[in-house]
Amino acid sequence: MTSLVYFSSASENTHRFVQRLGLPATRIPIHDREGTFEVREPYVLIVPTYGGGTTAMGRDTSYVPKPVIRFLNNTHNRSLIRAVIAAGNTNFGESYCFAGNIISQKCHVPYLYRFELMGTAEDVERVRAGLGEFWDHLDDEEHEKWRRPSQTPSTRGA
């Protein structure tokens, strides 16, 4: 298995989820304004979804936290992403875990899973097992089955 990279805001929800996974993980710094943080190996990104909204140019980038955008704008970091997992809040309706959709589409990587807030014990088990299976089959032709964001499981039926 290869590494996890994640971002967590001051709420620490994503951080707590990653800790419960018990897998090697690296946190994207909250205050890396220059985007100089770099990874050294392929990774799966775990990211929270922010509130969203449309910019003056009509682009909707605010679902993805700015430190994650800076991190992925680094071509080295972007070249090593292999998949994304998103966290969110079902109170946001259709925007639930939307950061995962955006990153999956823009980086051309599978969207493996989504979970609410800091996840349930079942989410932790599913992600842990799913990551093992994902890394084991990354080079197989079957890896295409992972490209189904609309079918990722969610808690509370969202």
From Swiss-Prot:
Record Gene3D superfamilies: 3.40.50.360
GO biological process: protein modification process
Disulfide bond positions: none
InterPro entries found in the cross-reference section: Flavoprotein-like_sf, RNR_Ib_NrdI_bac, RNR_NrdI
A GO molecular-function annotation: FMN binding
Family assignment from sequence similarity: Belongs to the NrdI family.
Function field: Probably involved in ribonucleotide reductase function.
NCBIfam families: nrdI
Name of this chain's protein: Protein NrdI
